[in-house]
Amino acid sequence: MSTSRPGAQQLIDTVVDPDSFVSWDQPLDLSGLDETYRATMAKASQRSGTDESILTGRASIRGHEVALIVGEFRFLGGSIGRAAAGRIVAAIRRATTEGLPLLAATASGGTRMQEGTPAFMTMVDISAAVVAHKAAGLPYLVYLRHPTTGGVFASWGSLGHITIAEPEALIGFLGPVVYETVNGIPFPSGVQVAENLVAKGIVDAVVPVEDLAEIASRSLTMLSATTERTADPADHPAWPITPFVSRPEPSEDEIATLWSAIETTRREDRPGVRELLRHAADDVIPLNGTGFGELDKGVMLALASFGGRSCVLVGQDRRYQVSESMGPAALREARRGMRMATELGLPLVTVIDTPGADLSPNAEEGALAGEIARCIADMTSLSVPSVSVLLGEGTGGGALALLPARRVIAAGNAWLSPLPPEGASAILFKDTDHAPLLAARQRVGAQQMLEDGLVDVIVPEDPAAHEDPEGFAAAVGATVTAEIEALLTPVD
């Protein structure tokens, strides 16, 4: 990061009215962290001058009261762990309660690798809080700073009413360093740049930091009719932060078992969404495309019936993703399914099974990150029952986009990770040999996710799905039916 670019506190001092900023941040509880992680946090704090990668609070900008969420890239690359996410959610909810407009100034590489899947899933919590804030009629302004990539750009960084960016800021789904580490080749230059995203209609404008106060003030003046204060801030303390707790080092058996499961989900003969429908659905009516002239076979959309219950099904098709990665159009087709379910009052069933979304320049310029964010936003605000099925591979934002349902089912060998384990290993250890260990540390497996409260039900694989595709599909279908029935049953 260029030394000429302001850090979090410097940006706050530049943008807000003098002496108006009041921090909402509570002291962090680091007692649950292991010694190594605690030392890493201490070094990051000393380097950045902040206690976390996020600062939040209340201030005025040219007389307009506003809530602030500001990222600090010098703190572990601005990465978002559970404490940082809890701080963000607390600030958003407090802003909503107090009727304040919200300005988020991002600077982040995405999910914190030290915390893995439990941290990755907090992008859903943050997005849901943003959706609720916007549903209350309150403005949400986003200022994308250098750099903003990964899960931050693919969630709350892409949900603003107005989205502006710092000049020449690096902004993209997968940062170029991570891309080259994972793929072995550099990402084409000139794509993940603020000015290019403006040219492609993804960002509204490029605004220097020194002009941010003016554009924010003008925007808030126009939107002032929607931002009247509804409560006294003293009556609403900040939302409590959920601390991250380090787990014991995984045993050799745990590492081997999880890695065997991951390899099993990558088998060519593993059944996918088509086998699920063939063996478990009563009837299926396939649908096609976005309805706006786009088609991506990486996602299939259908009306389906399980156990006599009709639903809209959106499923990632592992067969088609072998030759072509899932792009933005696939997620727009998924959102068509979400709209259809809402309009028809039908349950929505999503099936997650992907080695990862398309990482090409075309996908970046087609608003892949924004489509992931909008899928998450739509999933968290559905008015109809929803069930998601983590069927096999669950790599990155493309998987997270369809996961946040009311009930989450996982196959016994399924997994979810912010990056392929080999990619995360390459980033942290400069090799892929540590992938099995890192996958276990990041708690990517179905059983770990169940223990962490991220999955509701596991469908056992005994035998593995590829050894009995019909039986596996029937078991998943029966679980889907049971979960739909439970959601449709009135609670006394």
Predicted feature descriptions by range:
Residues 109-229, 352-490:
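Conserved catalytic cores of soluble enzyme domains
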Residues 21-42, 62-77, 97-104, 134-144, ...:
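Charged, low-complexity, helix/coiled-coil-prone segments
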Residues 57-134, 141, 302-380, 386-387, ...:
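Cleft-lining beta-strand/loop regions that shape enzyme active-site pockets
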Residues 8-11, 84-91, 122, 193, ...:
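General structural feature for long, well-ordered alpha-helical segments within catalytic domains
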Residues 1-61, 65, 213-311, 315-323, ...:
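Intrinsically disordered, low-complexity segments enriched in small/flexible residues
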Residues 150, 247-248, 343-344:
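Short hydrophobic "helix-edge" motifs at membrane interfaces and signal-peptide entry regions
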Residues 14, 18, 23-26, 30, ...:
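Generic structural "secondary-structure junction" signal
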